[in-house]
């Protein structure tokens, strides 16, 4: 019976959330688990709570470290892991009791198993929009198409297979041998985007994976979520991430398909930065947002990559409109477009 190493980084988590998370793991119907809780120097009583659970369950290992961030917490746990498989869970989330069992049922001949999630906010719960069928991928061309979609972050057409849960570290069952043999780690120098880079590198070494079209993970949405907060280094970090993708994927220089895919990603990130950085309500320099955005668009990789985007391969949709405006440097129109879309989403109650 193969073992799963369940890795949970812990830092400043509400006691109720942390307990719910740990108990949802310890009560799994698949029992051969190694539960690694990493107390990342949390200043509250999170470390003590983890220790109490370890006293009750011999499968629980607690690593106490000075605060080094979520990436180092995961990396240190990977070093300690002994299971044939690894899965990651965020300490403020929880999982369905049969998550590990269903994932292990699909592990045979696979290098990775992926599944869907619930999005939970207070008493509301909805299933994350994802690919709507079970899927087993062992065809090299289809695997490449899915990886290109991952690199691009958006679909070129409505017929493409897109699985958003491929991007983050949760909702995954990874083969530890692939991680170990290829020395795949989370980049601790990055404050965001390190999880997607980890997955993209991992995907380079897989031959087959299975997607389970069933929500088995509960992702908690709340005010403290990092996705909703302003990060002063967002523009710089995003630029560094784009450069790391360039380094990770040599085919960007040898394949027109990969080159255009990368260029599209640069454009998508540029648009993302309008809302997450330049026009974010907590940006203290928001009054200079337009001028600073223009300066960034004249820097690399943005300037060359966005100019080189081939829009002909895309269906006409909202993404194509954004990229067209960026490609032809209609920056004032891009800002107006963003504000219009944002206003409509607020009216509709879309986050």
What are these regions (language model features)?
Residues 13-27:
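Short, well-formed alpha-helical segments that are part of the catalytic scaffolds
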Residues 31, 39-48, 90:
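A conserved acidic beta->alpha catalytic loop
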Residues 86:
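Short aromatic/hydrophobic "clamp" motif used to bind/position activated sugar donors
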């Amino acid at each position: 019976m193969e073992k799963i190493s369940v890795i949970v980084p812990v830092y400043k988590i509400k006691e109720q959330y942390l307990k719910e998370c740990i108990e949802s793991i310890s009560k799994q119907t698949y029992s051969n688990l190694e539960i690694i809780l990493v107390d990342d120097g949390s200043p509250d009583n999170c470390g003590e709570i983890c220790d109490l659970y370890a006293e009750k369950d011999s499968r629980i290992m607690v690593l106490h470290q000075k605060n080094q961030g979520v990436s180092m917490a995961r990396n240190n746990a990977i070093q300690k892991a002994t299971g044939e498989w690894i899965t990651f869970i965020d300490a403020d989330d929880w999982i369905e009791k049969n998550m590990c069992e269903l994932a292990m049922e699909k592990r045979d001949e696979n290098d990775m198993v992926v599944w869907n999630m619930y999005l939970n906010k207070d008493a509301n719960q909805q299933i994350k929009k994802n690919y709507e069928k079970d899927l087993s991928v062992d065809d090299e061309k289809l695997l490449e198409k899915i990886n290109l979609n991952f690199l691009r972050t958006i679909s070129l057409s409505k017929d493409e297979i897109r699985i958003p849960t491929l991007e983050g570290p949760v909702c995954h069952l990874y083969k530890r041998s692939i991680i170990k043999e290829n020395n795949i780690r989370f980049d601790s120098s990055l404050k965001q985007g390190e999880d997607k880079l980890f997955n993209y590198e991992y995907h380079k070494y897989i031959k087959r994976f299975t997607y389970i079209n069933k929500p088995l993970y509960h992702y908690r949405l709340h005010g403290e979520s990092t996705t909703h907060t302003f990060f002063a280094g967002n523009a710089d970090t995003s630029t560094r991430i784009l450069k790391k993708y360039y380094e990770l994927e040599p085919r960007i220089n040898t394949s027109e398909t990969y080159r255009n895919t990368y260029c599209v990603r640069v454009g998508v990130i540029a648009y993302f930065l309008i809302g997450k950085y330049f026009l974010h309500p907590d940006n203290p320099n928001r009054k200079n947002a337009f001028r600073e955005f223009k300066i960034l668009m004249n820097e690399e990789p943005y300037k060359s990559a966005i100019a080189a985007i081939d829009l002909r391969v895309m269906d006409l949709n909202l993404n194509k409109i954004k990229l067209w405006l960026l490609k032809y440097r209609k920056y004032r129109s891009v800002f107006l477009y963003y504000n219009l879309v944002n206003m409509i989403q607020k009216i509709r109650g879309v986050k």
